[in-house]
């Protein structure tokens, strides 16, 4: 397995903050206190697109992921050499399949060949990983760049990474909060590959727009 990805996912679970609180699970009762009742059935968003770019069709039909809420932001700027250094962040919470645990998708588009869905590290770290069955190279005929996709954290997380020709990098993570006994497999890899393929061309033009401060849907 790839230790970094495990650390990244754990950091994201611990640092989710306000967005996580919006869909937190019910607490446990203590001595002399009646246990909390089960959480009500969540309300799933019916939008065709989440975070302006994420197709709900792929989430629902291919990943069995139904979104309860999300937050996103994007910013544009110019680097020292005059090149665009745009950023885009999208965090989605939801349910996967028939399970009641919270599942999360985190998406980050970042300059400087940096992967930053949870904590920053260079794309070149993936190139330098020794060959193994977890890290799978990936490419598409109709888009420029190259990437990897892999399963980590005892099969409880999938990560996809993409390096654009202009050295922006895209990272997508799909994982459970640790409460669900679920193991991802090659079918999930195929679904994540389709999501990556859709987002590679969709995110850059949105990230280059006028800055969008962090926006929650629905607003907590």
Identify the meaning behind each predicted range.
Residues 2-16:
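Bacterial N-terminal signal peptides that target proteins for export
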Residues 17-18, 22:
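Hydrophobic alpha-helical membrane segments, chiefly transmembrane helices and signal peptide h-regions
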Residues 24-27:
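C-terminal motif of bacterial Sec signal peptides marking the signal peptidase cleavage site
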Residues 32-220:
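A small/polar (G/S/T-enriched), proline-flanked helix-loop surface module common
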